[in-house]
Amino acid sequence: MSDIEERVKKIIIEQLGVKEEEVKSEASFVDDLGADSLDTVELVMALEEEFDTEIPDEEAEKITTVQSAIDYVNAHKDA
């Protein structure tokens, strides 16, 4: 597991109050991890803070699964 993947999963666990084993790559924040719209906004804010980046709203709407969050950070970490 990459450092970024570990950091993203740690944020998801902290923000959503879920168990580590529930945080699978394909897990949907809403459908699988029980997040609501406020949870997803807070999750995006935590990702922005952790990775010192700004995620535009139109991009944030596409971050709906654990893997999509990891992919977004990987794609934008050097931007």
Curated annotation (Swiss-Prot):
Residue ranges constituting the Carrier domain according to the UniProt record: 2-77
Pfam families registered for this protein in UniProt: PP-binding
Compartment annotation: Cytoplasm
Cellular component, GO, one term: cytosol
The protein's annotated pathway: Lipid metabolism; fatty acid biosynthesis
Classification via InterPro entries: ACP, ACP-like_sf, PP-bd_ACP, Ppantetheine_attach_site
Annotated function: Carrier of the growing fatty acid chain in fatty acid biosynthesis.
Protein name: Acyl carrier protein
Organism of this sequence: Pseudoalteromonas atlantica (strain T6c / ATCC BAA-1087)
